[in-house]
Structure formats: C-alpha cells, structure tokens
Amino acid sequence: MFYDYADSGSWTESTYRSNESDFQKIKLRQRVAVNMTNRTLETTMVGEKVTMPVALAPTGLTGMQHADGEILAAKAAEKFGVPFCLSTMSICSIEDVAERTTKPFWFQLYVMKDRGFIERLIERAKAACLLYTSDAADE
C-alpha cells in the first residue's frame, strides 16, 4: 500500500500519465563557456528571500515513508534556503516540525466541515504563509 501511495496516481492515473508524458518532452539546452560569475537564482517568495524559486510542496503522509519525513524535509529546505510547506495530512505535528526548525514554514490548509477544528489548526500553524487547498471535496 505504501509503495502504491508514493509511486502511483489516484483513480485512473490519467494525471500521473499526462505529467510523465509532459516531463519527457522537456529538453534542457546545455550552455557551455558562459561566464556565471554574477548570476544567481536568489529571489523572494511571499516577501522572504530564498536561494532559488523552489519550495518543497506539501505531501500528505510523508511520515509513512519515514517516521520523521516532514521534519527531515523541513530541515533540508531550511539548510538549502527554500520554503517548506507542511501538509494538513502530515504525520508529524505542526509543533514537532516547528520545534526542530528555526525558520517559519508554510502550512497547507484543507478546509473541512468542522470549522472549530480548522480555527484551532490555523491558530496552531501560525505559519509565514497559509496555503488554501480547494481541490479536495468537502466531506
């Protein structure tokens, strides 16, 4: 079950197959003998300086692959100077990730019917950035 979760797509896997096909079409153009001295990938994202315009996206149940999966991902993002976003469906708690990192992280919010739970979750998150997920059915 864990392998299928990590290495497949949902339902008919049509999006998974489409993404795989699209990635195969990407061709990187190699450039050699170019002076790279003054080039940088540094930029800002939601007002914060980052080393490159990349963020570690929220991945639900990362802890199924490794008990401290979200913590390790957050620490790696911090080490390399890019944002980390914790999923509502993470195995590690907001508090556990915050305790083991020094920078604020983003939090992906799935809005559910229990508004009290959502309000408490937002209060716990106190993230630098709150990402609202609108692709999930309201159960």
Positions of the model-derived regions?
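Hydrophobic faces of well-ordered beta-strands that scaffold small-molecule active sites
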Residues: 54-57, 84-86, 105-109
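Internal gly/pro-rich beta-alpha loop/helix module
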Residues: 116-131
